[in-house]
Swiss-Prot record:
This is Glycine--tRNA ligase. One of its GO terms (biological process) is diadenosine tetraphosphate biosynthetic process. Homodimer. It comes from Caenorhabditis elegans. Its main location: cytoplasm.
Length: 742
């Protein structure tokens, strides 16, 4: 019986091997840029021999982070390994002959080896990404560093150096062009100090919190969900952990986003998790509000907070913005500014910080019509969507056209889908690797009760999938909350096809009697009565008639009203417009997180020289567009240098002159390291013709061309703006072969 089963299974497995070989899963021919003056050479790539720990790291990475294409290739191999693992257990349980078990073990080992080799061959470079080398580069070249470092530093606060500051500024400039200018948005710049009543109305005072646990002996604090995640991942990587415990841990990780304090306490207790620093017991999770409190003015009575998001400044200015837009919907407002969150335990560099730059859009739209004319322009654009259904079913993310996703109601509406597509375009434009970008839908227990749909743009880094952009349909919640708190209507008018007669019922307060009965609370009661809908007033009237008493709840306090406290007014009015509270579609961008992901995705190592690292930014966002390098300090080159600088300045191209005494190769390496995409070399051949000529070197490929200085500014400008690619320049201008190795 075993022999027959083994034979059939082996035949199927042989087909798998032939399939993967034919698809070049293991053997590829690629052209590798040489570091020396040698042409590109074909090189056979095979799965390298990694040590066991590294192979396991790659396998674990692919189980969590594989793209749909990679997962489709690995799934049958994993199933083949599982098949023989189950078969061996079954043979042992039935007391099968040792020779049959040994045959099965040999086959299982072969299948495991094929799976491991395939994982290594298919694994993207980031699976074995060396974060320490990137961090060394960023710190050494001062892209950013911990704030107040000479005083010991403060976790969660960072200062950007010249390169980091310029990179960030270029990203923000491109964001402003991509959204505010192209979409005709209204830009505002609101204060970071926010009075407590504003954030009380928005819900931040009561609900903007994370669950925190403390070391019971020394009081050290940890964010509960992060502690659980890190502890479970440690268990999963421990060979001594049983299969049942690993499965339990994986189930917890899949549901962790929706856990409350009770769920987290149950997990910490069940797995017996301790403090990762001391091993001490932990307290039960408690809520920790993430806002920084402060006071406005000298008395300390005016409570305020540093804003946790920029959105509230737009909401409270809605009436002014609507007026500026001639009262028309839809329209979008945008703001670029700082947000502040008092994180419990900031980790992972720029990914989790206490002060950060946000770019937020609030798109106000008719809640009954969220269609968008411009959606047709992006309907065919494909995005990798990780829907809530796929998450719950354990299925991988899928590449889907956004038009199809909206048509099937996977994405709630056209406006939300449009901003997701535009988000994808922006991230690709600044240099995010499209293979490491997906949109994950919030599960129902993750979303706020008022939200209708939410998709996070997540970028894959060495820390895992990181939420960098939130795209949410917030419905009418925020404007309604601020109306309730201020009694200022935040509505738009929608013209009706034909005038209609509408019956109104209002509760008018008897302020004289309310003042006698309720003193200072009379005004608050009057405001609450004014905010009642016609249906609520009718219910109030019925209760007053039946019981001669009505309990009105305001801010959690009840007030007993009698018929004498108010008058019920009924009337009919012909209306030509309908007042509506707009829904809000909100894309929210965390610039620091996108910037860190970009740094990882742009990090490179020279082939054959792993110590020679550099950053390959897209010219559009590169901190400095080109370097200017004289081949020597000879004074005869000065006129050419001056002409080059004048030409670059004419086209507003940033440049860095490096006229130090090092070799040209060493200077190339220095400028490559900080992400300068183009190097302009002034050599003695530059003087041989009139007008002067120079060479331009492309940092990533190290190829060079020669052209006249008069053409330099236009070419660099076109390369930066994307009007030309480097391949276009190579086709137009003569190739330059360096006379010395770099």
């Amino acid at each position: 019986m075993f022999s027959s089963c083994w034979l059939k299974s082996s035949v199927r497995y042989s087909r798998l091997i032939r399939q993967f070989s034919s698809e070049n899963s293991f053997f590829k021919v690629e052209l590798v840029p040489s570091d020396r003056k040698t042409p590109l050479q074909p090189r056979k790539v095979v799965a390298p021999r990694f040590e066991k720990k590294t192979r396991q790291k790659i396998s674990d990475y692919l189980k969590q982070m594989a793209t749909p294409e990679i997962e489709a290739k690995l799934a049958p191999l994993r199933a083949a390994v599982k098949e023989y693992g189950d078969l061996i257990r079954d043979l042992k349980a039935k007391g099968a002959p040792k020779i049959d078990i040994d045959k099965a073990v040999v086959e299982l080992k072969a299948r495991k080896r094929l799976l491991e080799d395939t994982e290594i061959a298919l694994a993207p470079k980031e699976a074995s990404f060396d974060r320490l080398k990137l961090e060394d580069l960023l710190k050494r070249r001062f892209f950013y560093d911990q704030s107040f470092a000479i005083y010991g530093g403060v976790t969660g606060l960072y200062d950007f150096g010249p390169m980091g500051c310029s990179l960030k500024a270029n990203m923000l400039q491109e964001w402003r062009k991509h959204f505010i200018l192209e979409e005709g948005m209204l830009e505002v710049d609101c204060t970071s100090l926010t009075p407590e009543p504003v954030l009380k109305a928005s819900g931040h005072v009561d609900r903007f919190a994370d669950w925190m646990v403390k070391d019971m002996k020394n009081g050290e604090c940890f964010r509960a969900d992060h502690l659980i995640k890190n502890s479970i991942e440690k268990l999963l990587n421990d060979k001594k952990t049983s299969a049942a415990v690993k499965q339990d841990g994986q189930d917890v990780l899949a549901r962790l986003e929706g856990f409350d304090n009770k769920d987290m306490h149950e997990v910490i207790t069940r797995f017996n998790f301790k403090s990762p620093i001391t091993g001490n017991d932990l307290t039960e999770p408690i809520a920790f509000n993430l806002m920084f409190p402060t006071q406005i003015g000298p008395t300390g009575d005016f409570k305020a907070f540093l804003r946790p998001e920029t959105a509230q400044g737009i909401f409270v200015n809605f009436k002014r913005l609507l007026e500026f837009n001639q009262g028309k919907l839809p329209f979008a407002a945008a703001q670029i500014g700082l947000g502040f969150r008092n994180e419990i335990s900031p980790r992972q560099g720029l990914i989790r910080v206490r002060e950060f730059t946000m770019c937020e859009i609030e798109h106000f739209v008719d809640p009954e019509d969220k269609s968008l004319a411009k959606f047709a322009k992006v309907a065919d654009q494909k995005l990798v969507l990780f829907s809530a259904c796929n998450q719950l079913d354990g299925a991988p993310a899928q590449e889907v056209a956004i038009g199809e996703a909206v048509a099937k109601k996977t994405v709630a509406n056209e406006t939300l889908g449009y901003y997701m597509a535009r988000c994808h375009q922006f991230l690709m434009k600044v240099g995010i690797d499209g293979r490491r970008l997906r949109f994950r839908q919030h599960l129902s227990n993750e979303m706020a009760h008022y939200a209708q749909d939410c998709w996070d743009a997540e970028i894959l880094t060495s820390y895992g999938w990181i939420e960098c952009v939130g795209n949410a349909d917030r419905a009418c919640y925020d404007l309604q909350q601020h109306y309730k708190a201020t009694n200022v209507k935040l509505v738009a008018e929608k013209k009706l096809p034909e005038p209609v007669d509408v019956n109104f019922v209002e509760a008018q307060a008897n302020m004289a009697l309310l003042g006698k009965s309720f003193k200072k609370d009379a005004k608050k009661i009057q405001t609450s009565l004014q905010q009642l809908t016609s249906e609520q007033v009718s219910a109030l009237e019925e209760e007053l008639l039946a019981k001669k008493l009505y309990n009105l709840s305001v801010d959690g306090q009840n007030y007993a009203l009698t018929p004498e406290h108010l008058n019920i007014k009924k009337y009919t009015k012909k209306i030509h417009v309908q007042e509506i509270t707009p829904s809000v579609i909100e894309p929210s961008y965390g610039i620091g997180r996108i910037m860190y992901a970009l740094l990882e995705h742009s990090f490179r190592q020279r082939e054959g020289d792993e110590q020679r690292t550099f950053l390959a930014f897209k010219p559009l966002v590169a901190p400095i567009k080109c370097s200017v390098l004289p081949i020597s300090a000879n004074d005869t080159l000065i006129p050419v240098m001056d002409a080059v600088k004048e030409e670059l300045s004419r086209f507003e191209m940033s440049y860095k002159v490096d006229d130090s005494s090092g070799t040209i190769g060493r200077r190339y390496a220095r400028t490559d390291e900080i992400g300068i995409p183009f190097g302009i070399t002034v050599d003695f051949d530059s003087l041989k013709t009139t007008p002067f000529t120079v060479t331009i070197r492309h940092a990533e490929t190290m190829s060079q061309i020669r052209l006249e200085v008069s053409e330099l500014g236009r070419l660099i400008s076109d390369l930066v703006a994307g009007r030309q690619q480097w391949s276009d320049a190579q086709a137009k201008y003569p190739k330059f072969e360096a006379s010395a190795t770099e």
